[in-house]
């Protein structure tokens, strides 16, 4: 990851995609607005579960001119990853699951989250009630890199409206077939979610915004 950052690979890849209409279509067809309120742009894909993948995660906290609710968005991952802060500053929190219940702790619904191969469709199966303990606050500034193990439960603090946050993510091999998510607003049953893939024009607008250029 360090070598990719030194060579400014995020900027080079974005400009290469913007300069090639066919690549713009290909990348748009595998990118989408994630349910956790960020744009997931898959720059370089890899269908091998033991392979690596490069993505951009760009937070836009005013989708459709609606206020984003105060949702927990706490989760872990199927894979470990390295993340370079390309724009802005990332604030996040890490948690562990409490082993003993306490009346002083918030109670969450814990779900088993299974995404589709394309990622834009997923199911959540209710697992159990759980309580969490926050163990770390993280602040990672523009230009810095951090590593997150797939078993780490965390959440990214959504940036304030108008603030830029974009990360360049190198995803490692898949470690398991599911993740866990914790919240208080999903029902205690199975739910499904589906969001559309991006259109080329939509992706172009988002990439130009990330670069800080006028559309």
Residue ranges and their predicted role:
Residues 27-30, 68-75, 135, 155-157:
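Catalytic micro-motifs at enzyme active sites that drive phosphoryl/nucleotidyl and oxygen chemistry
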Residues 176-215:
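Long, compositionally biased interface segments
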């Amino acid at each position: 990851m360090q070598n990719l950052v030194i060579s400014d690979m995020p900027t080079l890849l974005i400009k290469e995609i913007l300069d090639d209409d066919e690549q713009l279509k290909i990348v748009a067809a595998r990118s989408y607005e994630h349910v956790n309120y960020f744009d997931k742009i898959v720059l370089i894909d890899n269908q091998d579960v033991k392979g690596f993948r490069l993505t951009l995660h760009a937070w836009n906290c005013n989708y459709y001119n609606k206020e984003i609710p105060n949702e927990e968005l706490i989760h872990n991952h199927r894979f470990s990853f390295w993340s370079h802060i390309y724009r802005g500053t990332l604030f996040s929190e890490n948690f562990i699951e409490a082993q003993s219940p306490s009346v002083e702790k918030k109670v969450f619904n814990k779900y088993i989250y299974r995404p589709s191969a394309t990622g834009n469709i997923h199911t959540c199966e209710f697992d159990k009630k759980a309580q969490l303990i926050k163990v770390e606050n993280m602040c990672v500034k523009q230009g810095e890199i951090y590593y997150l193990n797939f078993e780490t439960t965390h959440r990214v603090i959504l940036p304030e409206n108008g603030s830029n946050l974009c990360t360049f993510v190198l995803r490692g091999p898949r470690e398991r077939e599911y993740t866990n998510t914790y919240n208080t607003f999903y029902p205690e049953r199975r739910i499904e979610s589906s969001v559309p893939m991006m259109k080329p024009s939509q992706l172009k607008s988002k990439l130009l915004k990330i670069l800080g250029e006028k559309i």
